[in-house]
């Protein structure tokens, strides 16, 4: 194919291929066990596939309504009200999205104007900042530090200016596996009270919280719910990340702006999958039982590495485990992850990739959303270092 005949000014000149793609590709090339990218290596229940097939075979294969199938929006509304006590209107306050990343991107581009500032907490999921920059906004980065990765509320207060348009939060947090508390949400509410600041709450791991803790959702905090986009993911909840289906909750004024953008970047989402998910959600145990399911995997993984030379950080939620490796190597985290993949046969993610300045605290991220046989094989290799 001939090359493009003129210079091209990139909208994202500093952005390359994501670290997740890089490490997964390297894992495949090396035949390594992939504990890098955050997806399961096991299937969802057959009944979910059967419901998709049912809706396909009975003729539900055309466009769904722009906001999503009403049956699914109603099921989401019922779940949210049961869990968090807030009634969202399925007609005007819930939208089904093509995954959580699309929901985050759409929320940012719908509300951020050139010159606006958006506060993010590093280490930060890699889609946030590009969305802000494409909207013409300026990311304001506040750093969370190992080992506890707690927000510094004095720093948050100092970072808020008249130009602050939005604050993006993520709880349970990827990559650190920390969770925010109700007290954290109260502090956030106090800092944004009387302002026009919008909160985008990335809560895709809402059902994966351990040790008897409860997820502190912005949807359950009336003051924050009134100014927040709350984003969740069916992929994370039902082990179907490749289906790319999520949803967003917001008060009708915010949702009206969201849908203006949503209708032009995806319009709508796969119809039979939406209807199948509406059916599948009827059994609440499928999401309320997720914490125990993943806590067992977390416990297995941590126990299997207890005598290794890795120092495991606390994991309070998500399906990720951070580990220090200073007792093993003096390499930087990216080089160490490459070494692990090529020489040890286990792929992980360097946490420096989640910091704009590449801050390297010699911490890497493993994903334990895997079959026990996969985790056992990976831990055998990691224990041999």
At which residue positions do the language-model features occur?
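Conserved glycine-rich beta-strand-loop-beta hairpin in the small C-terminal domain of fold type I
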Residues: 278, 294-302, 312-325, 359
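Active-site phosphate-binding strand-loop segment of PLP-dependent enzymes
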Residues: 140, 144-211
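Conserved core segment of the aminotransferase class I/II
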Residues: 220, 226-295, 299-305, 385
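N-terminal small-domain helix-loop-helix segment of the aminotransferase-like
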Residues: 2-4, 9-99, 106, 280-282
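A short helix-loop-beta submotif of the ANL/AMP-binding
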Residues: 134-140
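Helix C-cap/helix->beta junction micro-motif
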Residues: 30, 135, 194-195, 308, ...
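Conserved PLP-anchoring active-site segment centered on the Schiff-base-forming lysine
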Residues: 110-132
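PLP-dependent enzyme catalytic core of the Aspartate aminotransferase-like
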Residues: 78, 339-348, 354-385
